[in-house]
Amino acid sequence: MHLTAENLAARRGEDLIFVNISFHLAAGEALVLTGRNGSGKSTLLRVVAGLLKPEKGTVIFRDGEGWKDRHPGEASHYLGHRNAMKNELTVAENLEFWRAFLGHPTAGLPLEEAAEAVGLSGITHLPFGYLSAGQQRRIAFAKLLVAHRPVWILDEPTAALDASADRLLAELITAHLAEGGIVLAATHQPLGLENVQQMKMTGFAGVDHGVWG
């Protein structure tokens, strides 16, 4: 299983945000994007997720079953700044919608198990809008667990989380990688992960590569 981006360029309005960005991730690997606001982190994530058309370049996901090339959007979870949940629906109703929309009903954790995995068991009957900002973000992560997809694309995943939730998030990502998943994340702070690739976005000037470990 591989996720490959080659010579990507993207615009915001009339302006080029970045050019010639390439990376390659195999099963069990993660790439963390860092850089100042406006440097193109979120734009790159949206391009890889298939939510924004690149100015040039290609993104290919190749699965391990017959080595079929697919667009990453067909095999990925995208978690943006917003949680993509309806406040008036219960937690269970929100998660059930995403499970049906994103994957096979049996290819993921049951709803209560997913809620327990993010430390919020016993609240799936509550309206999503009743939850605190931190609880809402945790439930957004439960969405990744109820429908299995091998690629996680995460934009500032620690937003609204406290230190204990940060650690829980790191554990979830580590477990996903250990199972052969791929993670592409943008953040302003370390995610508590070991031996992951790092790409520092510097806007149109380019990117710098490194490794956190």
Q: What spans do the regions from the language model cover?
A:
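Q-loop/switch helix immediately C-terminal to the Walker
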Residues: 82, 87-102, 110
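Hydrophobic anchor residue at the start of the ABC signature
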Residues: 141, 180
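Conserved ABC ATPase "signature" region
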Residues: 96, 108-123
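A short, proline-enriched helix->beta-strand linker immediately N-terminal to the Walker B motif
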Residues: 146-150
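Catalytic Walker B motif of ABC-type/P-loop ATPase nucleotide-binding domains
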Residues: 152-156
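Helix-to-loop junction immediately C-terminal to a conserved catalytic motif
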Residues: 49
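Conserved ABC transporter NBD signature motif
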Residues: 54-74
